[in-house]
UniProtKB/Swiss-Prot annotation:
Its cofactor is Mg(2+). GO terms for biological process: canonical glycolysis; fructose 1,6-bisphosphate metabolic process; fructose 6-phosphate metabolic process. Mg(2+) binds at D103. Keywords: Allosteric enzyme, ATP-binding, Cytoplasm, Glycolysis, Kinase, Magnesium, Metal-binding, Nucleotide-binding, Transferase. GO terms for cellular component: 6-phosphofructokinase complex. Its main location: cytoplasm. It holds the Pfam family PFK. Homotetramer. HAMAP family: Phosphofructokinase_I_B1 (MF_00339). GO terms for molecular function: 6-phosphofructokinase activity; AMP binding; ATP binding; fructose-6-phosphate binding; identical protein binding; metal ion binding; monosaccharide binding. This is ATP-dependent 6-phosphofructokinase.
């Protein structure tokens, strides 16, 4: 394989630029040419394809977002869109593609592979909801951004004796809420993987203020459960009388310079994706397991998800065997500040 392309698709994630940089530099070192595709699959179909060299990826490792831009392109789910994209790739002499993104992006890569066009996936999403990897690119940065924000919210919460509901991203997976909540010492964490009793939530708030002598209460809520405003309304209807505020961290979690960890794993996975294409291997997704590079069928990575579930005892049972187990219940309460 002499010429490959790289694209980013779906929601952006800090560290995507580091992965693109690694793909380009590794490919050049292997004597391969690299082309960039702007705007993901939309740019592929439109022929928005151009050469990438070391100069184009210089100084990109510290930048958030993706300089190749990103877009959601549902038309690529249709055969017509897939064939149009492959036609453009062949027109530019491209023999394989590295796709950086989440589950929707993986489905596109899977379709390319089914048509006999080699594609390798790199997990780039802050939600950490891709199977076959312990961590996705952008997750660590998003968690650190959330923790920094929650720490600041605790300051103002303590000053006024308030309850704060902090809504974070995570439509189908509560990983950001779980990790950020534990790291910030949140008092309660509400995730899609666990059913909650709103009356118990209210009782815990009351106990903290009246019996434990606390002057704040922080609840981290994954957006996949419901909106922060809707959750606050349920709290009030269930009898919560605390001075309640809602903050939605929203898209701020997608921005910012990637952490050292995100830069490193993005670089590892980007280089490994090139190695797989050089060997003629398509239909695979790259991942990190126990700090080592792994690969798995892209079909499974796209379909299985990486969601965890919680037992009655509060233990996390991970559907993705490449993810760690945590004692959720113990950490959630014993580490709350």
């Amino acid at each position: 394989m002499k010429r490959i392309a790289v694209l980013t698709s779906g929601g952006d994630a800090p560290g995507m630029n580091a992965a693109i940089r690694a793909v380009v530099r590794k490919a050049i070192s292997e004597g391969m040419e690299v082309y960039g595709i702007n705007r993901g699959y939309a740019g592929m179909v439109d022929g928005d394809i151009f050469p990438l060299g070391s100069k184009e990826v210089g100084d990109k490792i510290s930048r958030g977002g993706t300089f190749l831009y990103s877009a959601r392109y549902p038309e690529f789910a249709q055969l017509e869109g897939q064939l149009a994209g492959i036609e453009q790739l062949k027109k530019h002499g491209i023999e394989g593609v590295v796709v950086i993104g989440g589950d929707g992006s993986y489905h596109g890569a899977m379709r390319l592979t089914e048509h006999g066009f080699p594609a390798v996936g790199i997990p780039g999403t802050i939600d950490n909801d891709i199977a076959g990897t312990d961590y996705t690119i952008g997750f660590d940065t998003a968690v650190n951004t959330a923790v920094e924000a929650i720490d600041k919210l605790r300051d103002t919460s303590s000053s006024h004796g308030r309850t704060f509901v902090v809504e974070v991203m995570g439509r189908n997976a509560g990983d950001i809420a779980l990790w950020a909540g534990i790291a910030s010492g949140a008092d309660q964490i509400i995730v899609p993987e666990e059913e909650f009793d709103i009356h118990k939530v209210v009782s815990t708030i009351k106990d903290d203020f009246e019996n434990r002598g606390k002057n704040h209460h922080i609840i981290v809520l994954a957006e996949g459960v419901m909106s922060g405003e809707a959750f606050a309304q349920q709290l009030k209807e269930a009898g919560d009388e605390s001075d309640l505020r809602v903050t939605n961290l929203g898209h701020i979690l997608r921005g910012g310079s990637p952490t050292a960890r995100d830069r490193v794993i993005a670089s590892w996975m980007g280089a490994h994706a090139v190695e797989l294409l050089k060997e003629g291997k398509g239909g695979l997704a790259v991942g990190i397991h126990n700090e080592e590079l792994v690969e798995s069928p892209i079909l499974g990575s796209a379909e299985d998800g990486a969601l965890f579930s919680l037992t009655d005892e509060g233990n996390i049972v991970v559907n993705n065997p490449h993810k760690a187990r945590l004692d959720y219940a113990a950490l959630n309460r014993s580490l709350a500040q």
